């Protein structure tokens, strides 16, 4: 997934940055400037790839700890981990959204699912958040949702 993410991002950035503008003549100054822009773009793409990898790695590690807390019925630990782990997902979400089917599984809100008449398909962090903070319980459904979340996080990673 990381390589695909990088490829998608790099391709998009390169296509946008390397457009062909026939109104400009290609002289040595323009060519050197284009080379500089391409080098900067390549460097920025590498930096963003590294950053995204770091965020997704932390997201997966945190999700594993979060799911373990739920499996152990440790409400306090699950609540302590929730905002930290969500932060890593939010930071990587622009890339995660490129994989359309995974982002809604991980990050959908109930209101959005109801609007699409898909509330029975609701899963992910916000469903578990509801169990922890509104329902104030960890039950078998919460544990099943946590296992699915971990599976989806691994697939995203």
Language-model segments: residues:
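Mature extracytoplasmic or organellar-lumen-exposed domains after removal of signal/transit peptides
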Residues: 32-157
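Positively charged n-region of N-terminal signal peptides that target proteins for export
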Residues: 1-4, 8
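C-terminal motif of bacterial Sec signal peptides marking the signal peptidase cleavage site
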Residues: 14-17
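Intrinsically disordered, low-complexity, charge-biased segments
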Residues: 19-33
